[in-house]
């Protein structure tokens, strides 16, 4: 399935909104802790993990590095670039988003005892995470602030109509 077919909508997230949503996630996670530390899924989970680490006063932050996207195309293969030891007991895994669940499934297999939280969740991946804040439809591309910049956009009325 091509990107054009898969993503029919774009959901832009600002730095302020991401911070607000990550803090809201922290409120939900507060009652489920305490945690030994955070395992951030790089790269998308790094910024939310920093906010959550501050809010939960967690000083130990590890990373697991998995490559699955090439721009807007999600690849079918996941490349594990860095992992962590253990089964995840007492640890909090943080990612920005669970989409199709490919990355989440792989991390769940590696760290089955960790608590898995994401800021945003799509229906296909939602069952793989324990806690999330905002659900977004499967056909929506979430445009994170680290992937965008402020620029002029043509008003909707002047844009070509999509079927």
UniProtKB/Swiss-Prot annotation:
GMP binds at residues 99-103, 141-142. It is a peripheral membrane protein. 5-phospho-alpha-D-ribose 1-diphosphate binds at residues 43-44, 95-103. Xanthine binds at residues 99, 142. One of its GO terms (molecular function) is xanthine phosphoribosyltransferase activity. PANTHER family: XANTHINE PHOSPHORIBOSYLTRANSFERASE, XANTHINE-GUANINE PHOSPHORIBOSYLTRANSFERASE. This is Xanthine-guanine phosphoribosyltransferase. It comes from Nitratidesulfovibrio vulgaris (strain DP4).
């Amino acid at each position: 399935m091509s990107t054009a077919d898969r993503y029919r909508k774009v959901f832009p997230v600002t730095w302020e909104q991401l911070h607000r949503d990550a803090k809201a996630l922290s409120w939900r996670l507060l009652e489920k802790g305490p945690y030994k530390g955070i395992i951030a899924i790089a790269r998308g989970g790094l910024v939310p993990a920093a906010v959550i680490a501050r809010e939960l006063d967690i000083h130990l932050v590890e990373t697991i590095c998995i490559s699955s996207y090439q721009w807007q195309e999600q690849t079918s293969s996941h490349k594990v670039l860095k992992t962590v030891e253990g089964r995840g007991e007492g640890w909090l895994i943080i990612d920005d988003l669970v989409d199709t669940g490919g990355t989440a499934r792989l991390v769940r297999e590696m760290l089955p005892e960790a608590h898995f939280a994401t800021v945003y969740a799509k229906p296909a991946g939602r069952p793989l995470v324990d806690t999330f804040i905002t659900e977004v439809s499967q056909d929506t591309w979430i445009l994170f602030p680290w992937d965008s910049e402020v620029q002029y956009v043509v008003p909707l009325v002047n844009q070509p109509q999509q079927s």
